[in-house]
Amino acid sequence: MSFLIDSSIMITSQILFFGFGWLFFMRQLFKDYEVRQYVVQVIFSVTFAFSCTMFELIIFEILGVLNSSSRYFHWKMNLCVILLILVFMVPFYIGYFIVSNIRLLHKQRLLFSCLLWLTFMYFFWKLGDPFPILSPKHGILSIEQLISRVGVIGVTLMALLSGFGAVNCPYTYMSYFLRNVTDTDILALERRLLQTMDMIISKKKRMAMTRRTMFQKGEVHNKPSGFWGMIKSVTTSAPGSENLTLIQQEVDALEELSRQLFLETADLYATKERIEYSKTFKGKYFNFLGYFFSIYCVWKIFMATINIVFDRVGKTDPVTRGIEITVNYLGIQFDVKFWSQHISFILVGIIIVTSIRGLLITLTKFFYAISSSKSSNVIVLLLAQIMGMYFVSSVLLIRMSMPLEYRTIITEVLGELQFNFYHRWFDVIFLVSALSSILFLYLAHKQAPEKHMAP
């Protein structure tokens, strides 16, 4: 009876997650597109529902909600379904919609979709060869084979996003990095833009006048005919045509310059708005957050470097370890186990909420940046694939933030994976991503004032 009640709770929550994914799809991703493939919408919503269910089961594990056997059953079922979606269903439909957009392959799209899926499976399987991700006793058809490979892709993605986010967040929030933009700077750039537009207009007028003169002289229509006439037309040109070509090249260069000046002007306006915003209470709050995240970024880079150099992976979750150090230093009586459970629950909850929110915001921006009416179905399925792999990998990494007694069921469900490898791999990719982001933002920040203030 308790199993039925537990299952009804899980099914209800999955229906709610599915509905939220459906609404997000309709009101965010596809609100500007008329053509909707319901199979794409269903796949995206189902992936979102089962991804969120994994996080729900982590919270239930900490709070002790549901029977332990029920939790284990739903862990196993949820994991099998999400892997089925990520490895078999989504890649096949991505190939199907890619082939459907090619007219030459339209009649045999099912065959070519299968070929694309087999190609994906080959590279997906070969991905596991260079990495020590499995225990030697796992068979080739075990579920761990799929989890391990999905984990490598997802952890790599998480580390790349985390590395860039850890650097970009303080850079975006802190007023220290804002350039000092005045109205004089904006007016000077707008004056250059107007001068460029005037030059483009005057040169186009000259081109129109030249064409009119050539037309009146009969240089446009009196073309020689026959073979020798064609040879002559190639080897010789009308007196005004060379001038037209030269002016057209100048116009093209000026139009490119005008586009750059327009973008720089818009950037200066945005920077000026950010300067005004930084003076408000909310702006000062985000500025404080920027300093906090900059300290976190430095600490995270330092710890990732230490972990890589000394091949170190923590065995105790950060909350418990931090409380133990504080209690030992202050010499006070404190129930470490009791409070570490509650603080770990809050920490894991914050990680889950921020991960889901941050990923959805990133997915929305990414979708609007690259999608079109023809490619939108493929892009949504790619986002569903990324989302599922991201959440599966989050479970692998969140495991280390949980007290030891709560890690057991996750270890049992995921199998005997080499969890330490995933943490080391995350540190390596995070460090590369963070340092690359620092270099990129430094060069962009250094070059921006020179570009904007050039005479």
Swiss-Prot record:
Residues that carry a glycan: 180, 243
GO molecular function annotations of the record: voltage-gated monoatomic anion channel activity
Subcellular location: Golgi apparatus membrane
An annotated GO cellular component: Golgi membrane
InterPro entries on file: ABA_GPCR_dom, Golgi_pH-regulator_cons_dom, GPHR/GTG
Record keyword Ion transport present: yes
Catalysed reaction, written as an equation: iodide(out) = iodide(in); chloride(in) = chloride(out); bromide(in) = bromide(out); fluoride(in) = fluoride(out)
Source superkingdom: Eukaryota
Entry keyword set: Glycoprotein, Golgi apparatus, Ion channel, Ion transport, Membrane, Protein transport, Transmembrane, Transmembrane helix, Transport, Voltage-gated channel
One GO process term, biological-process aspect: intracellular pH reduction
Membrane topology: Multi-pass membrane protein
Residue stretches spanning the membrane: 5-25, 46-66, 79-99, 114-134, 150-170, 290-310, 343-363, 378-398, 425-445
Complex formation: Homotrimer. Interacts with RABL3; the interaction stabilizes GPR89A.
PANTHER family: G-PROTEIN COUPLED RECEPTOR 89-RELATED (PTHR15948), GOLGI PH REGULATOR A-RELATED (PTHR15948:SF0)
Protein task: Voltage-gated channel that enables the transfer of monoatomic anions such as iodide, chloride, bromide and fluoride which may function in counter-ion conductance and participates in Golgi acidification. Plays a role in lymphocyte development, probably by acting as a RABL3 effector in hematopoietic cells.
Family: Belongs to the Golgi pH regulator (TC 1.A.38) family.
Name of this protein: Golgi pH regulator
Gene that encodes it: GPR89
